[in-house]
Structure formats: C-alpha cells, structure tokens
C-alpha cells in the first residue's frame, strides 16, 4: 500500500485526469462525508458537488466552505431524511433533474446507533439508513453513473471487513437484534449487493470502506460525550484525523487501484496510481474485480472465507432479489421511477 504522503501526492495530481468531476455526497453535512467532499473540491479544478442530507444549517456551512476552498466549483444542497425510502426517491429525482451524469456517489449517512426504532414504512431505522436507503440511492443513480467516462464509482462508508453470517430468515430484521448487530448485518448485505452489482454494471466500481476510528460528531452522539472521550483516549494510538480520512477516501473514490470489472475506456480505470500502489484484490479474490472491501487506508480487508461461502451459495444475487422485493413492498416499485 502507498503511504499517506504518497496518497496526498496522488490526490494533488487528480486534476490531471479529473479536471472536472460530478459527485454526490450522501451524508456530506458532517464528519467523514463532509471532509471527503472538501478534499475532493480542493483537488479538482472544476468540481460539481451535491451535498445530500437533513440539516440545512450544516449544509449552508459546508457549501460556504466548499466555495471558499474552490470558487470555480458548483455546489448544491439536496435536503432529505434518508430513513424513509420515499424521501430517497425524491432526492434522487432532484439530482437527476440537475445533472445528466455522475462520476461519484459517496455515501456515509446514518444516525447515531440507538435502540431499535421502526420507521412509518415498517422497516428497522438503522437498517434503512445503513443499507436500504444506500442501495436505493445506488439503484436510482446508476443511469447517471453509467453516463460517466471518469471512473464512475459508488462508495459506501460503513463496516467493510466486519461481515457476518446472516440469519437467512431475518434479512429485514423483523426479529429484533442489537444496534451493533444491525450495523454488521447491513455491512454484510452491502458487500454482497455490491459484489452482485459489479458483475451487472461492469463499467462502475463498487467500494465498501471501513473508516477506522475517526473523531467525528457521530462518536459523541452515539456514545455520549463522556464515554466518547474515554473511547477516544483508549483508541487514540489507532485513530486517524478527519483530514487523513479525507485524503484516504478521495484516493479510494478516484484511484485506478480500484477499477471496475470492465472499464469502457482508458480513463474508466480511474486516476493514476499513487507511487507504491497497485491494482487491488476485489471481494471475489481476483485483482480488479470491480467490488472492493477496504480498510480506511485503502488496503483490502475482505473476509475471504466468509465471502467465498456466500459466493458458493449465490447469495449476492439472493440479497439483491430480497432488496428489490423490499423496495417493491415499501415504495410500490422495485425499480425507481
């Protein structure tokens, strides 16, 4: 793996291959998503960035900072509460009305982990925010990603590498489970769905990232300020700063180290590799497989045995079929309008 300094250098050269880029950051009003958006804006000559989230006040601050970082860019806010799939559909429709192409869909949205709560659409809220809503964004914006010629990529920041053996009779978590279990359950379905989508949409890369221990507002909300401070002290030697997280995430979102299964052109593989970099092994165990399960620093962290076991059972297809069925039940349409 390239070092952080080598990744910074690669990001600084990003405008050579991506003088313009269109990106949507779902969860870009704070934390990891906000920082990634700012890093990208500073690395590209003329970015067009959509900040997608709930908080208008936070969005106004982020948009102002983006304009200050790069006045040549275009920055817009799309307001949405992603805990309801019908809201996700409206947000995607708004994005489709504003652009005909999308180079990057970067998703890091999600509330703090809390006790089980069901939405008015009948789904477990944590699972919606960490899986169903993210996949609905992905599904709805695939046509825009397919229209890109700049290494189109979907990035989901969650718990790559922390997949588990799923309860096959409880995919929608109708049977209550803990918030931590729910998140790992969502991470598993994310990795499986991305592996499936990479074989169907072969010109698009799908990346599932474990962000590492990053000091963000969500840490305080999830643990409480006192416990968050204790956790931060304990994990500080293993932690990274928001700035470092932003550098790593921009690299994973653009680098040729994570190409789609079948790039349609030379640019389609991504920006130049950092010094010391190489094409990454995908979730299938093959180099350049199109779907990737990555550590915060861009290294492969696929649970090979677990994912192979799912592959033997064709479980990626099964999970995607379940996902479409859920979309049909909740929104009245398996496919977006």
From Swiss-Prot:
InterPro entries, A to Z: NAD(P)-bd_dom_sf, SDR_fam, Sec_Metab_Biosynth_Oxidored
Cysteine-cysteine disulfides: none
Pathway stated in the Swiss-Prot or TrEMBL entry: Secondary metabolite biosynthesis; terpenoid biosynthesis
Any GO molecular function: oxidoreductase activity
Enzyme class: oxidoreductase
Pfam families according to UniProt: adh_short (PF00106)
The UniProt record lists the keyword Isomerase: no
Phenotype upon gene inactivation: Impairs the synthesis of anditomin but accumulates andilesin A.
A GO biological process held by the record: terpenoid biosynthetic process
Role played: Oxidoreductase; part of the gene cluster that mediates the biosynthesis of anditomin, a fungal meroterpenoid. The first step of the pathway is the synthesis of 3,5-dimethylorsellinic acid (DMOA) by the polyketide synthase andM. DMOA is then converted to the phthalide compound 5,7-dihydroxy-4,6-dimethylphthalide (DHDMP) by the cytochrome P450 monooxygenase andK, which is further prenylated by the prenyltransferase andD to yield farnesyl-DHDMP. Further epoxidation by the FAD-dependent monooxygenase andE leads to epoxyfarnesyl-DHDMP.
The protein's name in its UniProt record: Oxidoreductase andH
Provenance organism: Emericella variicolor (Aspergillus stellatus)
Organism lineage string: Eukaryota, Fungi, Dikarya, Ascomycota, Pezizomycotina
